[in-house]
Amino acid sequence: MAECSSMTATELPAKLAEIRDDFLELEEPDRLLLLLEFADELPELPPRYAEHPDLLERVVECQSPVFMFVEVDDDSAVHLYATAPREAPTTRGFASILSQGLDGLSAQEVLDVPDDYPNTIGLTKAVSPLRIRGMTAMLARTKRRLREGTA
C-alpha cells in the first residue's frame, strides 16, 4: 500500500519537483547550503506590500517572524509573497522554496500539492522538526487562503 509521502515527480508541479530533486541529489550538509541559497533568493516584497505591512499575515507557527500574502492575478496564477528576517536563513529558505515553487500555478494546482511536501525535500534530519512544521504551516496557510477565496 502506497503512503502519502511516497509521491512521484509527476504528481508535483514541475518547479516543486525540481526543487525537491535538487535537494535529494545532494549529501545532507550540502542540502543546508542549498537552503541558504534559497534564503538569499527570497524576493523582496512588491512595493504595494512593503509599504502596507498590515496586508501581510503572520505565520505564527514559525519560530521567526514570517509574514506572507497570497494573491491570484487576472490570469488565475497564484503568487506567494513572504518576508522573513535575514537572521533567520532557514525560515527565509523555506519561504523562498514555496514562493518560487508555487509561483504561477493555478489555485487548484497549489491545493493539490501534498501537505507533506516539506517532509520530502530531504531536510528532516538537517533542521529541527519545529522548522519543518513552520514550512508546513506556510503551505497550509497558502492553501487556506485559496480555499477561502481571500487570495
Could you describe each region identified by the protein language model?
Residues 9-52, 56:
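Extended low-complexity intrinsically disordered regions
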Residues 61-65, 75-77, 92-94:
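Short connector loops at helix/strand junctions that flank enzyme active sites
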Residues 79-88, 124-129:
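A short glycine/serine-rich beta->alpha loop
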Residues 108-113, 117-151:
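C-terminal binding/interaction regions
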